[in-house]
């Protein structure tokens, strides 16, 4: 049919190859195609420190080489020394000290002198006055008529209250304890309106404390029959029945339950 040596018209494709696996030494690894963040082996970048601090760190680390953290850089300690104070701080402290000294030295200037002192009054003008009159010569002249009026009203109200209390005293019994007149008057008014004491409410017809005629005991037929049986009753047949129940009707010989009781004829 054709020649034994046939050549394909299309070129053959190369074998598929993964780009991620191409750089892996062993492509059979289960995690060969997974890209990972490379581990940074190099030391972390340290901030650039001035030469003075570096020298101080070296001096601090040199005396004790047995420290377990000898190569680790630490925050340098603050060198203890006299810190120069700021000029503003000095000025403020001086101002505060001066203000405090002035306030302590002159306490009388801070207090206003509104009233004249005792030794400022001219007492030599009128030697006949007493010391109280000399201290307060204007006390009687400055009394207001309103204050006098209020004092009179207070006295009148006190007198009226005392009179009302005196009028209430005779109505009370000497043996009973004292109580306010308003409470007693209220109790009396309530008793008059009700017409009976509050305890009589419990003795009404509907209360369980009182016995009515319906609740009284009545003689029952059964109790009478029991009494008759104990004393002895003559039956219709003419026989005498005793309390022991020895005699009974001939038709009740077989009845053991009713041998102690007789039949009642209605």
UniProtKB/Swiss-Prot annotation:
Residues 1-84, 120-225, 242-266 are annotated as: Disordered. Residues 90-119 are annotated as: F-box-like. Keywords: Cell cycle, Cell division, Cytoplasm, Mitosis, Phosphoprotein, Ubl conjugation, Ubl conjugation pathway. Residues 32-46, 157-168, 203-213 have a biased composition (Polar residues). It comes from the Eukaryota. Pathway: Protein modification; protein ubiquitination. GO terms for cellular component: adherens junction; cytosol. A motif (KEN box) lies at residues 256-258. It is found in: Cytoplasm, Cytosol. Residues 143-156, 250-259 have a biased composition (Basic and acidic residues). InterPro entries: CDCA3 (IPR038832). Ubiquitinated and degraded by the APC/C-Cdh1 complex. Its main location: cytoplasm. The modification Phosphothreonine is found at residues 37, 75, 200, 210. F-box-like protein which is required for entry into mitosis. Acts by participating in E3 ligase complexes that mediate the ubiquitination and degradation of WEE1 kinase at G2/M phase. Interacts with SKP1. Part of a SCF (SKP1-cullin-F-box) protein ligase complex. The KEN box is required for the association with the APC/C-Cdh1 complex. This is Cell division cycle-associated protein 3.
